[in-house]
Amino acid sequence: MTEQISVGIVGIEYQLPCYKIDEAEIAPKIGWELNKIKIGLGMHEFGVVGHKEDVVSLALSAVDNLLVKYNVDPKDVGKIEVGTESHFDSAKSIKTYLLQLFNDNVSIAGCDTTNACYGGTNALLNCLAWMESSFCKHKYAIVVCTDISMYDSKPAVPTSGAGAVAMLIGRDPVYKVLPKTLFTYSTNEKDFLKHKSRYFPYIEGKESVEVYKKAFSNVYNEFISEFSPDYFNYMAFHSPFPKMVVKVCNEFNIPLEKVEDSLLASRHNGNTYTASLYFSLISLIASNKVKMNDVVCLFSFGSGCVGSIYCIQKVKEGCEIEDLRERLDSRKLINYEKYEEILENMQNYAIKDEEEDIKGYSIVKEENYFRTYIKK
């Protein structure tokens, strides 16, 4: 990225799953005290998809919300990049499903990116580079982060979650990306694996925490060697669970008041993988504390491992998030038995014909494994 062209986030929207489950339902089923989850992990509840929701329906809804909120002409979009690690199709990208929202615009570049929870940030960096290049002939690019996290490993269950974030990227941004602040760390790690033979991931929990901390240590120390720790006003993290973010902040002397407001979605919707960092950003924006010229530092991490740190600066008004708490509260609360039923169907890639209050796109049929989606 160059200094000459200002590129960044013009708008941001999101989609939550239709259900949620309280950690009080989870604790006795995994043999934990509730405080081990609420205090030890910082989790209160997490989002759960319905029988007619998947990563594509969440992405469709998030992008549709974005297009409507910012009155985007589909012809003005020239690139769509999707970050995900939970797509059910190894060949056809989620991006191609999203094209049903763009009428006759068949010249949209881009596809999907996968590297655990980092794919969304890689998609963003791709779109930023395209936006400031001579290849760009359009007004906007769109970045989508969409994921569903579910586990059969009991210690990981309380950190489940689901959701999608869509970001409108352009040359007249509300949040300008500051290119010289980007630092990346990447190594070959064996902390997390999704094998094609099974739905659920293999997790080395303690090792993954250490890899996360090692990645952060490397990029943050590089960052503060060139910029003061006071350079940024707020910080948002990829949040596997809120207490992990708090521990990292304490270890690196980052004031918690710079971070606390960003943890709302993580506490109440769980780990959304590629979308996690950007739900943290949404939570921070929703607090209405970010003022003109404030700098927000972002830390992205994906097991395996890739980690990056970079900063954005608010340079104009816009990008408001006014209803996050209300949308979190409006999800239907389910019990553990319902959760188990959904879990079983998800790992079998089954779709149950059940009436659900889905505010957005949902699966209407599956034929020869191809799924069709419509908006209610």
Functional labels for PLM-detected ranges:
Residues E13-Q15, G83-F88, N115-G119, V144-M150, ...:
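Acidic, glycine-rich active-site loops and adjacent beta-strand->loop/helix elements
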Residues I9, V55-N115, E226-F252:
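Conserved beta-ketoacyl condensing-enzyme motif
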Residues M1-K52, K154-E210, K214, Y310-K376:
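Condensing-enzyme catalytic core mediating Claisen C-C bond formation in acyl metabolism
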